[in-house]
């Protein structure tokens, strides 16, 4: 118990250390929330369209790195896909938290920024990153674009923008 008291005292005397720990925790929790919302929405949407479960989506995600032939023959690949999914969500979350204090307009209308960020995430994923993976280029279908972008706006953009806005608003007071 004495060691815990010293540790708390050290953090109180070292605001840089405390703020880095708090920021890291905020990024991790926000990334977990956004990633969970996103994979849940994608799974529900996929099930409603195909009748298939989340394993197919998670294998698809892993297939971006390993290729479909490897992914379909390995039972561990849905777990790999889930880990990859959360790594991507954490990356987009950390980037937003990094950009937020550097761009003054992000603090003004968090909900507009959330919509814009969700659309930006869709563009980065579907126009830049996915075509570079083993999945390759996919055909354009407006309905799929609208649904996918909508999911990313609601599940990634808005939650990240809202939570990071609250995080930084509390620190600037």
List where the protein language model places each region.
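Short, Lys/Arg-rich, polar N-terminal cytosolic tail immediately upstream
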Residues: 1-20
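Internal alpha-helical transmembrane segments of multi-pass membrane proteins
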Residues: 102-123
């Amino acid at each position: 118990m004495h060691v815990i008291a010293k540790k708390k005292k050290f953090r109180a005397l070292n605001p840089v250390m405390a703020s880095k720990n708090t920021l890291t925790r905020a990024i991790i929790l926000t990334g977990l929330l956004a990633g969970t919302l996103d994979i849940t929405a994608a799974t529900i949407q996929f099930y409603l369209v195909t009748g298939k479960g989340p394993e197919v989506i998670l294998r698809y995600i892993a297939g971006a790195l390993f290729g479909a032939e490897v992914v379909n023959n390995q039972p561990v690949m849905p777990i790999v896909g889930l880990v990859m999914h959360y790594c991507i969500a954490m990356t987009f979350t950390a980037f937003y938290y990094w950009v937020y204090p550097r761009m003054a307009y992000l603090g003004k209308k968090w909900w507009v920024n959330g919509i814009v960020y969700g659309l930006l995430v869709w563009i980065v994923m579907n126009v830049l990153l996915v075509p570079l993976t083993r999945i390759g280029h996919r055909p354009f279908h407006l309905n799929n674009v609208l649904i996918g972008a909508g999911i990313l706006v609601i599940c990634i953009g808005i939650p990240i923008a809202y939570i990071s806005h609250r995080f930084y608003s509390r620190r600037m007071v």
